[in-house]
Amino acid sequence: MGFPKVERLLINYKTLDEFKKFKGCGAQELSMLEELQANIIENDSESPFYGIYYGGSLIARMSLYMKRNGGEPFEITGPYLELYKLEVLPTFQKQGFGQMLVNHAKQMQFPIKTIARIHSAGFWDKLNFNPVSVTDGDFYIWHPETNLNAVTNEESA
């Protein structure tokens, strides 16, 4: 068995069965089951779901959406990713699988916006996300380092 990797999840009934394993493991606000069912009904071929399989079973998942423009108060200009939900089965938590999912999103080189749910602020801090408080709630934002380095290199020239 090879090392687990992040892959885009297919929108089908097999994935729906895998998602049912997560029901009851986490908070209701993390449930993606209804979201996946809606995508199956709409026959949406562009899956927003990513996951990690281990031993043939889905052990970690996230939903990731491309947004057009963040604007103010989010400190994002232009397109960005919204990492809407991330969940790892309890048996596999604290083993780096959540970080693997986030790193996969970071490799796309767009700013990322997320909400720290269920005592996860420390997780987002560790992954270099910055907290942003607005009237709608508290968010965490990550900016691609390449953009920051480009500015730094120009300033030093």
Curated annotation (Swiss-Prot):
Q: Does the keyword Transmembrane apply?
A: no
Top-rank taxon: Bacteria
**Where would I find the N-acetyltransferase domain in this sequence?**
9-154
Q: Which InterPro entries match?
A: Acyl_CoA_acyltransferase (IPR016181), GNAT_dom (IPR000182), YlbP (IPR017274)
User: What keywords tag this UniProt record?
Assistant: Acyltransferase, Transferase
For this protein, the record's NCBIfam families field holds:
PRK13688.1 (NF010241)
Q: What name appears for this protein in its UniProt entry?
A: Uncharacterized N-acetyltransferase BC_3921
Native species of this protein?
A: Bacillus cereus (strain ATCC 14579 / DSM 31 / CCUG 7414 / JCM 2152 / NBRC 15305 / NCIMB 9373 / NCTC 2599 / NRRL B-3711)
User: From which lineage does this chain's organism come?
Assistant: Bacteria, Bacillati, Bacillota, Bacilli, Bacillales
